[in-house]
Amino acid sequence: MENRIEMSQLRASKKDSKISYVLLMATKLYLEGGQPVGSKLLKETYCSDLSSATIRNYFAQLETDGFLRKNHISGGRIPTDLAFRYYADHNAPFLEQEEILAIQQKLTELPEYSKNIVKDLQKASEVLSDILQLPVCFSSPRFESDSVINIQLVAIDDQRVVFVLSTEFGQVFTDVLWLPEQLPENSLKRIEGFLQNYLRKQPSDSLLSQKEKDLGMVLYNEVVVRYLTRYCHFSEEDLYQTGLSRLLKYETFKDPETLAQGLAFFENRKHMCQLLNTYLHKETPTAFIGRELTDIVGNTDPSCAVITIPYYMDRTPLGAFGVLGPMNLPYQQVFGTLSLFTERLKVILTQSFYKFKLSFRRPCPTDPRCSQRPAELTRSSSIKLLPAKELS
């Protein structure tokens, strides 16, 4: 992002390395305990070579520079988003050996290479969310030569049904269909069976009435048109998310307004796609903290942090994972975990792409060639409209 916070704001980091160290250690202590940091506690833990008076003087300068704020109850200091940014930028990813072993064991739950690539990515996001105990989202391109393998109909009420269309690569499309009249449940099941049999080129149920068959053909064409519309017109990445309820265990998000702001940002497809694409060709994690998110969200300060990292097939980025959390995240551990995770995922995806000869396409909302692309994509789709003679 063009206007990310410049660390030159911390004037003392150039003049005196000690004040920089005090800031880093105060932030580290706050991340460890979650409580305002006093000069006495900081001296006892990480700054034994400095007097309490010197630490207080440094605290005062850091307050002036906007890196710390005073807690009016205890008198201790709390890091601001500038402090968390400085901490994230000046600490390499770090995991204890036992943490690495635990994460590697958890990563064995990732699926092996397969053709069901979207489902595998969704499973991977569940594993990552479980490891970090944080909400996770990821962006995904569309994979070519995908095949529709199933259609399901689920009744909502007397005249509306949801159709669920699933593909070989794990994509799922849903929409609502309107029935011309109320149908018995067993009739809807027979129509669903007709759609599935037609899709798989199998004979239809002998119990299917002509009226049910006619309705089935109309519904089939409606499903196909809606699917092809979404399949061909691809203006932004597909976005998947999980683990939103994990935010509730963090003190920051027990405030309803803060929780609503964080979730509103995470749920906004446009904002998240923009954020995930910002550093798509950077192989290391990137943190967006507090006010750094404001340019994407608008005037609202979301008081949270999002950490992103792209995932690769060989040397080609396919999309990115994003992690949402409070600003006081353990950045070193989160960065280290994301690096281990994407390294393992890269191996799996590379094997899948080469074994099954997969290809993909990205959104092209402004590409003039896109206007010619739908016809080509429609011809290559595995699902077709019924011939006119079958509808007569």
UniProtKB/Swiss-Prot annotation:
Q: What's the effect of swapping G33S? A: In strain: E/UW-5/Cx
Supply the source organism's classification. Bacteria, Pseudomonadati, Chlamydiota, Chlamydiia, Chlamydiales
Q: What InterPro entries does UniProt report for this protein, alphabetically?
A: GAF-like_dom_sf, HrcA, HrcA_C, WH-like_DNA-bd_sf, WH_DNA-bd_sf
Name of one Pfam family that matches: HrcA
Keywords recorded for this protein, A-Z? Repressor, Stress response, Transcription, Transcription regulation
Q: Which GO terms describe its molecular function?
A: DNA binding
Family assignment?
Belongs to the HrcA family.
Protein's recorded name: Heat-inducible transcription repressor HrcA
| Function according to Swiss-Prot or TrEMBL | Negative regulator of class I heat shock genes (grpE-dnaK-dnaJ and groELS operons). Prevents heat-shock induction of these operons.
Q: Which PANTHER family match?
A: HEAT-INDUCIBLE TRANSCRIPTION REPRESSOR HRCA
**What processes in GO biological process is this protein linked to?**
negative regulation of DNA-templated transcription
Task: State the encoding gene.
Answer: hrcA
